[in-house]
Amino acid sequence: MKNKVLGLGLGLAVVMSGSAVAAEGLDLAKASGCLACHAVEKKVVGPAWQDVAAKYKGDAAARDVLVSKVKAGGKGNWNEVTGGVPMPPYSPRVADADIEKLVDFILAL
């Protein structure tokens, strides 16, 4: 019985911490202006973040590639979605640590 309670508690902690990470990611996205062009589940101007996560799933270089893209901006990776509209650079307007948190949030979707 003790193991069941411990397992339930650990499972609940994982779910709650995942929710906290998701909430922090969305709050950071709102504060940084990301939601002007992106949404989690649907295309706005830029691709849906779920689509970004799916495209880069299993790619060991994904985090570095996306952090660089968010910092520097650019175009070309999602032309079929954006119609060629480039992503603006977010560095130095958004701190590097916050950009990394945003990318981690997106890749975890």
What do these predicted ranges mean?
Residues 1-8:
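Bacterial N-terminal signal peptides that target proteins for export
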Residues 26, 46, 63-71, 96-103, ...:
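An amphipathic alpha-helix signature
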Residues 30, 39-69:
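Gly/Gly-Pro-rich "capping" loops immediately C-terminal to redox-active cysteine motifs
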Residues 45-56, 72-98:
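Axial heme c-ligation environment in periplasmic c-type cytochrome domains
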